[in-house]
């Protein structure tokens, strides 16, 4: 099958690789333009652009798909289908209708729940028991298109990085299955109830609110790990917590209850396990405390 692939971050790589391994003809790869990154702020290509060039594929990085010339180039590929995985740009109606089989999206939630940009993080924050992947036929709405195939996976104690990686690989498998026998997966309209919106994550949400209890704080930590990393402030320094456990011990909100950084959250408490000081690598809590003590009774903000 002649495929246009559209994706940008690491999440999209398993699907691109799976399509290549399945023997499909990738006639073009679309990704967002290179962004300034690193200390020198030199333009850095997206993970998908980098991988596509390694594979010798034709790569396009338009800032928009609305221009007539950009749409003509897209149409000239005469693709059977466009496969989209976390591309990040709006697909106009003209683009959606160009491929013979339309545009299929790998979405990281059980639609109609968590439509939008951050379904993995929002599912963890909400305390959902399960997540998954929906292969959907794209339309002009925000993740409102008909569903072709769904697979669930338990969230358990996974953080956003681990869950996203798992979902990405499930999505790659499902997309290959759908394209192998498209007639076996007729589109099914999404339910009219149960929808929710997964707003893009804002870094301001990463400050841990211990007043909401240890259970919610632990969800917040998993939802923001590994990036941007949920954090607290100590002497005006941001200290990220990348892994933590809930403890039954009650304690004053935001106060350290011992010399091992057990943090009070009202009726329960939070025990950090993996932490990261500003500008340093992540490490076990005990390694940080050897040279950076935070004494009992400290009030964290």
Swiss-Prot record:
The UniProt keywords, alphabetically, are: Protein biosynthesis, Transferase
Q: Which residues bind (6S)-5,6,7,8-tetrahydrofolate?
A: 109-112
Q: Note one Pfam family from the annotation.
A: Formyl_trans_C
Question: So which domain of life are we looking at?
Answer: Bacteria
Q: Which GO terms describe its cellular component?
A: cytosol
Q: What is its EC number?
A: 2.1.2.9
Which leading EC class covers this enzyme?
A: transferase
Q: Which SUPFAM superfamilies match?
A: FMT C-terminal domain-like, Formyltransferase
What reaction(s) does this enzyme catalyze?
A: L-methionyl-tRNA(fMet) + (6R)-10-formyltetrahydrofolate = N-formyl-L-methionyl-tRNA(fMet) + (6S)-5,6,7,8-tetrahydrofolate + H(+)
GO MF term list: methionyl-tRNA formyltransferase activity
Give the family from UniProt.
Belongs to the Fmt family.
Q: What does this protein do?
A: Attaches a formyl group to the free amino group of methionyl-tRNA(fMet). The formyl group appears to play a dual role in the initiator identity of N-formylmethionyl-tRNA by promoting its recognition by IF2 and preventing the misappropriation of this tRNA by the elongation apparatus.
Q: What is this protein called?
A: Methionyl-tRNA formyltransferase
**Gene, per the UniProt record:** fmt
